[in-house]
Amino acid sequence: MVERATEVVEPHTQLLRVTLEADNARAYWQRSTPGATAGDQEVEQAFVEFWFGARTMPRVRALIAAFRARFAAFPGALAALHAWPDMDRATRVLVCHWHLQLSDPLYRRFTGDYLVERRQGGRETVSRGPVIRWIAEVDDQGRWSASTRAQFASKLLSAAHSAGFVASIRDPRALTLPRVPAGALGYLMYLLRSVVFAGSLLDNPYLRSVGLAGSAVDDKLRTVAGLSCRRTGDVSEFTWDHDSLEDWVRHTRGSTA
């Protein structure tokens, strides 16, 4: 039985230090191994070998800590990503987006609920001011000061821009949706199969964030290699051709066939 991780539900401030960082994330998963995710040895190696270019030791430490939480914390993900060196950029950005959603509940709500609701409500833009007010609403326990909420708003919008959900870095920012390659969707489905999360495999903030809901999910899943889904009313049945995410990557390499 594949070990199952759980999406993170406790709010934290890691996003204030490390946003999406798709290029650095790729450098991490190409070089890191599951057995090297404890202690400072990997941090030292990343610094000496310039995994992330000419970064300071504190910055390398922050990146490694973030990427461990986003990728290494989910069984099989790091091995699967290491086995997919020729991943296209569109897929890589989405993989980083979904892993950030899994590991950060505020980013998950922002991209999977708040931005979705704005689109559905006919609002075509988003600005920093309304995002700050939204953060104040969801921070019902008063964890963060006004200045911290303002920092969160900037970082959320920056990450959303990098992921393809907003078109610019200046207000008002037009809402957009990234293209979802079949290989990216296949990765997400096999990943979620081994994760405990709120929702179902066909209805969740990970799919909603990229504009996939209802029949659009069914249509897109037909293009994904290595799995099939039959839905009858509210009942869905998945057929998985591979035992794990890593097996799926090794057999399909994100194929759209």
Model-derived features: positions:
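DNA-recognition alpha helix
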Residues: 125-142
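Short, amphipathic alpha-helical interaction segments positioned at domain boundaries
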Residues: 90, 98, 174-213, 244-257
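Long, low-complexity, charge-rich intrinsically disordered regions
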Residues: 225-226, 231-257
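A short, conserved structural fragment
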Residues: 161-171, 225-231
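Short amphipathic alpha-helical interaction segments
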Residues: 55-62, 146-162, 210-223
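Eukaryotic partner-binding/assembly regions in large regulatory complexes
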Residues: 1-102, 113-114, 126, 257
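Inter-helical turn/loop segments and adjacent helix faces that build the functional surface
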Residues: 121, 138-147, 170
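Positively charged, polyanion-binding regions of nucleic-acid-associated proteins
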Residues: 28, 32, 94-124, 181-200
